């Protein structure tokens, strides 16, 4: 990685050869410039999730690493609406677990549900996110799943740029494939 930050493989993911995966994820997605993040923060480093989520071999390797940290007892997978749905679908193919998508807001038509797919009350869910800076979107998704009667067994972040700490502070178990500590 460049001199603007540092990266390391997440705890359990390193057992799955994630050191190489971390380098591949960062090489594919790390951009430099002046970026406005979805959190409202500005950064000179941006991780473009679509650069690894749309490359089949890298998506497969990332899904394998994420699947490797999903603990026994998890019965379902979920992801916040958006690009993370690509990753959660790939993880579902790796694990055979059913999945759900958590909308930001329920649609005004169809089922009008905030949680779409497979996440029944009582499900033990692994909530999966692609890149997290503040953890805000994942936290909202976790709360929506809990409101439906699900339990969050673990939150797994492909690239953590600080969100894991906030999620742990909120009481969640969190694992990351890659942890990035940007300098700005």
Where are these regions (language model features)?
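Short, glycine/charge-rich flexible loops or terminal/linker lids adjacent to PRPP-binding catalytic cores
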Residues: 85-129, 133-139
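Short glycine-rich phosphate-binding loop at a beta-alpha junction
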Residues: 73-81, 156-157
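Conserved hydrophobic/aromatic pocket- or pore-lining residues that grip, position, or stack substrates
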Residues: 40, 77, 99
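Short, well-ordered alpha-helices that flank and scaffold nucleotide-derived cofactor binding pockets
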Residues: 64, 68, 89, 93, ...
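Conserved dinucleotide-binding and phosphotransfer motif residues
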Residues: 73, 94-95, 148, 170
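Short helix-loop-beta connector
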Residues: 71-75, 120-122
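Active-site-facing substrate-recognition patch
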Residues: 2-72
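PRPP-dependent phosphoribosyltransferase catalytic core
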Residues: 2-24, 143-184
